[in-house]
């Protein structure tokens, strides 16, 4: 469910008067997504997305998110483009919520991605990293290594309710990652949440990237680790090296990884798995019964985390380069 704030047609028409989008002909709520209220708009000029930003999104971050999408789209990345109001602002107010009108992106997300799609994702991710260069605003990654311990404290006492021994296991993992986390890797703007439902395809062609509301500044290779975790594991928990090889080769067709990034990838993948495990664990334990949130099983990411612990080299992810030569 992704409509938390209802709007009337008169309210919407008044709001749209500040935009050069024509006259409203129809609108409907969009069911996917959990952070904001989203509506599909049809006007005499075409189709658009209206987003009302709910309380879970920090309003202070909105200039970064909207400015980044505008920056990336101007540089040729296929992503939603926030439309300016008559006064030039990208953000307005509707029903007491910050709101934006964004271009409509054709396509659908894939429920069963294959290796060819992973290659396209890798290529698009690298293109996004390059397009993000020069973006003036910055935003720290609140869900990187510095944010994991506070998140863990919220769930630690009840962790063994999910699996026996989990509290001790995750405490040790967190301590290890805090001690060994990389410090000097190439940085830039990252998406940080490029799961399959945030990538649109038309047939087998990638048509665009969406949902930049976790975007931030961090290690570029961390974004790759997020994608390895979200695109390259099968439902039975096994890692598909064919998909990993495709994703990594797609990325490197645009931007080559440094030797330091190659060496750090197993550690970054562990960290990415822990990050999504911790947020899922929190939601699993703390979401009230009856809340309009679909809880996701945290153990899926525990399985991935344990896989990464055993990885010795990035070659095990499908990176087919001589690390020593980089």
UniProtKB/Swiss-Prot annotation:
CDD domains: HomoserineK_II. Its EC number is 2.7.1.39. It comes from the Bacteria. Pathway: Amino-acid biosynthesis; L-threonine biosynthesis; L-threonine from L-aspartate: step 4/5. It is an enzyme of class 2 (transferase). Keywords: Amino-acid biosynthesis, ATP-binding, Kinase, Nucleotide-binding, Threonine biosynthesis, Transferase. GO terms for biological process: threonine biosynthetic process. It catalyses: L-homoserine + ATP = O-phospho-L-homoserine + ADP + H(+). The keyword Nucleotide-binding applies. Belongs to the pseudomonas-type ThrB family. This is Homoserine kinase. It comes from Sinorhizobium fredii (strain NBRC 101917 / NGR234). The lineage of its organism: Bacteria, Pseudomonadati, Pseudomonadota, Alphaproteobacteria, Hyphomicrobiales. The gene is thrB.
């Amino acid at each position: 469910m992704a409509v938390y704030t209802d709007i009337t047609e008169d309210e919407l028409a008044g709001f749209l008067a500040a935009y050069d989008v024509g006259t409203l002909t129809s609108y409907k709520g969009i069911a996917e997504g959990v952070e904001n209220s989203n509506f599909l708009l049809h006007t005499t000029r075409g189709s658009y997305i209206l987003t009302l930003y709910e309380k879970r999104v920090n309003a202070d971050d909105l200039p970064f998110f909207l400015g980044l999408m505008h920056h990336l789209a101007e540089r040729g990345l296929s992503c939603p483009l926030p439309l300016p109001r008559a006064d030039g602002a990208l953000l307005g107010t509707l029903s007491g919520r910050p709101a934006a009108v964004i271009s409509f992106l054709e396509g659908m997300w894939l429920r069963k991605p294959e290796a060819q799609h992973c290659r396209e994702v890798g290529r698009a991710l690298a293109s996004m990293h390059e397009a993000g260069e020069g973006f003036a605003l910055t935003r720290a990654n609140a869900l990187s290594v510095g944010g994991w311990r506070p998140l863990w404290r919220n769930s630690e006492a009840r962790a063994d309710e999910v699996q026996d021994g989990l509290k001790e296991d995750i405490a040790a993992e967190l301590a290890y990652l805090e001690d060994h986390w990389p410090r000097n890797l190439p940085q830039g703007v990252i998406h940080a949440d490029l799961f399959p439902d945030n990538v649109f395809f038309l047939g087998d062609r990638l048509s665009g990237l969406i949902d930049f509301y976790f975007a931030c500044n961090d290690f570029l290779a961390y974004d790759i680790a997020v994608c390895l975790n979200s695109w390259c594991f099968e439902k039975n928990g096994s890692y598909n090296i064919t998909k990993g090889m495709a994703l990594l080769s797609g990325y490197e067709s645009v931007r080559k990884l440094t030797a330091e990034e190659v060496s750090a990838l197993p550690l970054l993948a562990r960290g990415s798995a822990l990050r999504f495990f911790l947020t899922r664990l929190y939601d699993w334990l703390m979401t009230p019964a009856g809340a309009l949130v679909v809880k996701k099983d945290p153990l899926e990411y525990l399985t991935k985390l344990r896989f990464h612990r055993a990885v010795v080299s990035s070659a095990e992810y499908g990176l087919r380069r001589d690390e020593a030569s980089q």
